[in-house]
Amino acid sequence: MANLRKSHPLLKIANDALVDLPAPSNISVWWNFGSLLGLCLVTQIATGLFLAMHYTSDIATAFTSVAHICRDVNYGWLIRSIHANGASFFFICIYLHIGRGLYYGSYLYKETWTIGVVLLLLVMMTAFVGYVLPWGQMSFWGATVITNLLSAVPYVGGTLVQWIWGGFSVDNATLTRFFAFHFLFPFIIAAATVIHLLFLHETGSNNPTGLNSDSDKVPFHPYFTYKDLLGFAVLLTALASLALFSPNLLGDPDNFTPANPLVTPPHIKPEWYFLFAYAILRSIPNKLGGVLALLFSILVLMLVPFLHTSKQRSLMFRPVTQFLFWSLVADVMILTWIGGMPVEHPFVIIGQVASLIYFSLFLVLIPTAGLMENKILGWK
């Protein structure tokens, strides 16, 4: 009789994805981040579920309900700390995962890459609506500023904003629907993740060389299950350390003040993981232009597979493009720094230059470098 994991209709799916999956023998630690993102998602759904049991999505009680969770609920402080800092780790893993994909040419699996960008947008939307829920000053004003961007849409902008607000300002209706969205989206993300994996397993994983690895595959279990477990241990240790020793390190002090529509905080800024996009938004003095730049700063990833000009897949053997890739990493870090700075000289011009370099690298410099490397190597 055949092994149950190979014959049972449900176990067979899990077996083909996690046990007998043929994986390249040379994939490095950069391939760990997919499973780490899965771990982050499970952690966020689990902690979020327990928070939702005690949270109330009403402007009169939202802030105090979060305080109640931290003070009166058994280990509520820990659950909230893990959930809030888990979001930061989620984005660290996402950005490293995307960076890996860009460096090693994994984006040439177009379907997997496209659904990955959709996943990024979903996670960003989830994090945004989640940040509004504690109903602190930065929650309220962040929601006001970001939802107001939709008013830049020609003709229907104003109506669209009021439709999302559920009134004429960010109010109770807004908070209630944001809570509903924040509860729903993680399950949509989980479903999209399954599709992401489905497309990945159609082609198999890429590897650091970017070459075909069909001749040298190893089973996923035990080799990569144990390798992933090491990653899990590192991530959970880091998350627990941050949540226990310095839970408010990445938060904004303004969010310890209950939301007040009559008092605007001196500097409205999002969480650190959105600062690069926020800097790009602010670098354009026109409202509609800024909104389009903000959207395109993420959607430019969709174009990457179509702008691949090199005959080689990975950057492993392409020093010129490697330099441009690390320039992009440095540029995103500069944008992140600028996004948290006030709108004044010299930060404005630095942000504008960094935004220009960001788009130039994706759309012009990296594709041109690919063509140049082909020519140097004499590849037609």
Swiss-Prot record:
<comment type="function">
    <text>Component of the ubiquinol-cytochrome c reductase complex (complex III or cytochrome b-c1 complex) that is part of the mitochondrial respiratory chain. The b-c1 complex mediates electron transfer from ubiquinol to cytochrome c. Contributes to the generation of a proton gradient across the mitochondrial membrane that is then used for ATP synthesis.</text>
</comment>
<keyword id="KW-0472">Membrane</keyword>
<comment type="subunit">
    <text>The cytochrome bc1 complex contains 3 respiratory subunits (MT-CYB, CYC1 and UQCRFS1), 2 core proteins (UQCRC1 and UQCRC2) and probably 6 low-molecular weight proteins.</text>
</comment>
<keyword id="KW-0999">Mitochondrion inner membrane</keyword>
<keyword id="KW-0408">Iron</keyword>
<protein>
    <recommendedName>
        <fullName>Cytochrome b</fullName>
    </recommendedName>
</protein>
<dbReference type="InterPro" id="IPR048259">
    <property type="entry name" value="Cytochrome_b_N_euk/bac"/>
</dbReference>
<dbReference type="Pfam" id="PF00033">
    <property type="entry name" value="Cytochrome_B"/>
</dbReference>
<dbReference type="InterPro" id="IPR027387">
    <property type="entry name" value="Cytb/b6-like_sf"/>
</dbReference>
<keyword id="KW-0249">Electron transport</keyword>
<dbReference type="InterPro" id="IPR005797">
    <property type="entry name" value="Cyt_b/b6_N"/>
</dbReference>
<dbReference type="GO" id="GO:0046872">
    <property type="term" value="F:metal ion binding"/>
</dbReference>
<feature type="binding site" description="axial binding residue">
    <location>
        <position position="83"/>
    </location>
    <ligand>
        <name>heme b b562</name>
    </ligand>
</feature>
<keyword id="KW-0349">Heme</keyword>
<feature type="binding site">
    <location>
        <position position="201"/>
    </location>
    <ligand>
        <name>a ubiquinone</name>
    </ligand>
</feature>
<keyword id="KW-1133">Transmembrane helix</keyword>
<dbReference type="GO" id="GO:0008121">
    <property type="term" value="F:ubiquinol-cytochrome-c reductase activity"/>
</dbReference>
<keyword id="KW-0813">Transport</keyword>
<keyword id="KW-0496">Mitochondrion</keyword>
<dbReference type="GO" id="GO:0005743">
    <property type="term" value="C:mitochondrial inner membrane"/>
</dbReference>
<dbReference type="GO" id="GO:0006122">
    <property type="term" value="P:mitochondrial electron transport, ubiquinol to cytochrome c"/>
</dbReference>
<feature type="transmembrane region" description="Helical">
    <location>
        <begin position="33"/>
        <end position="53"/>
    </location>
</feature>
<dbReference type="Pfam" id="PF00032">
    <property type="entry name" value="Cytochrom_B_C"/>
</dbReference>
<feature type="binding site" description="axial binding residue">
    <location>
        <position position="196"/>
    </location>
    <ligand>
        <name>heme b b566</name>
    </ligand>
</feature>
<dbReference type="InterPro" id="IPR048260">
    <property type="entry name" value="Cytochrome_b_C_euk/bac"/>
</dbReference>
<feature type="transmembrane region" description="Helical">
    <location>
        <begin position="113"/>
        <end position="133"/>
    </location>
</feature>
<dbReference type="InterPro" id="IPR005798">
    <property type="entry name" value="Cyt_b/b6_C"/>
</dbReference>
<keyword id="KW-0812">Transmembrane</keyword>
<feature type="transmembrane region" description="Helical">
    <location>
        <begin position="347"/>
        <end position="367"/>
    </location>
</feature>
<feature type="transmembrane region" description="Helical">
    <location>
        <begin position="320"/>
        <end position="340"/>
    </location>
</feature>
<feature type="binding site" description="axial binding residue">
    <location>
        <position position="97"/>
    </location>
    <ligand>
        <name>heme b b566</name>
    </ligand>
</feature>
<keyword id="KW-0679">Respiratory chain</keyword>
<dbReference type="InterPro" id="IPR016174">
    <property type="entry name" value="Di-haem_cyt_TM"/>
</dbReference>
<dbReference type="InterPro" id="IPR030689">
    <property type="entry name" value="Cytochrome_b"/>
</dbReference>
<keyword id="KW-0830">Ubiquinone</keyword>
<feature type="transmembrane region" description="Helical">
    <location>
        <begin position="178"/>
        <end position="198"/>
    </location>
</feature>
<dbReference type="GO" id="GO:0045275">
    <property type="term" value="C:respiratory chain complex III"/>
</dbReference>
<feature type="transmembrane region" description="Helical">
    <location>
        <begin position="226"/>
        <end position="246"/>
    </location>
</feature>
<feature type="binding site" description="axial binding residue">
    <location>
        <position position="182"/>
    </location>
    <ligand>
        <name>heme b b562</name>
    </ligand>
</feature>
<dbReference type="InterPro" id="IPR036150">
    <property type="entry name" value="Cyt_b/b6_C_sf"/>
</dbReference>
<comment type="similarity">
    <text>Belongs to the cytochrome b family.</text>
</comment>
<feature type="transmembrane region" description="Helical">
    <location>
        <begin position="77"/>
        <end position="98"/>
    </location>
</feature>
